[in-house]
Design a protein with these regions (language model features):
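Short amphipathic alpha-helical surface micro-motifs
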Residues: 26-28, 64, 137-141, 159-161
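ATP-binding pocket architecture of kinase catalytic cores
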Residues: 1-109, 113
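Intrinsically disordered, low-complexity regulatory regions enriched in Ser/Pro/Gly/Thr
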Residues: 22, 38-39, 149-151, 161, ...
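Short, solvent-exposed segments of well-ordered alpha helices
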Residues: 65-68, 149, 153
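Active-site Asp-x-Gly
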Residues: 116-117, 152-157, 163, 168-188
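Acidic, glycine-rich loop-and-strand cores that form catalytic or ligand-binding grooves
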Residues: 90-147
């Protein structure tokens, strides 16, 4: 069971979408709301447990190299996800059109956004010259960011937290699953 202050209905929906597409994820058994629960734990997801060990903890258990089958299986899953198209409008948001969760933005919640311009404006707005060695470096970075924001990108479904600790590999070297879909959604 997952029951944290970050657990959401959107995460359960993301997992169900991935499972329906053949991507190995824990199977959602049920999802529930707990509006009066302590510590802001308002949602829980009851799910199956996947076998394997995370890539982050695999150094002693697996020989990680390009010969392992998990790497090709990982590529297939990612390519498959990249083929999905957003339903209806090209909203940047969760699978159900609500806000996205990301540990990479202040407050950890953002959107949904009606277009890419709105999305990029939100991402760049907290930028501050204080984080750079000089004002010139800050200005140069803003110009570069603005150029990137002018490009039009396809809206694709993305896991949102694709790190080694969220990828499981079995003892046989095969991909056994992806965890933590709380940041998943439609992104440029």
């Amino acid at each position: 069971m997952k029951w944290t202050d970050r657990t959401s209905i959107e995460e359960a929906v993301s997992m169900q979408m991935a499972e329906a597409a053949g991507i190995p994820v824990p199977k959602v058994i049920s999802c529930g709301e707990h509006p009066t629960a302590p510590f802001n734990r308002k949602i829980s997801i009851l799910m199956t447990r996947l076998p394997g060990v995370s890539l982050e903890n695999s150094n002693d258990l697996l020989q990680i190299d390009e010969e392992e089958p998990w790497l090709e299986e990982l590529k297939i899953c990612i390519c498959s996800m990249r083929l999905w198209r957003p339903p209806g409008q090209k909203i940047i948001g969760s699978p159900i059109g609500t806000s996205l969760r990301s540990s990479r933005v202040p407050g950890h919640i953002m959107g949904p956004f009606m277009d890419q311009k709105e999305f990029y404006k939100y991402l760049i707005s907290p930028a501050s010259a204080h984080a750079f060695e000089s004002t010139a470096e800050y200005e140069k970075t803003l110009v570069r960011a603005d150029k990137l924001c002018q490009r039009d990108y396809r809206i694709l479904f993305t896991h949102g937290d694709f790190k080694a600790h969220n990828i499981l590999v079995g003892d046989d070297g095969h991909l056994s699953g992806f965890l933590d879909w709380e940041s998943a959604g439609w992104y440029p």
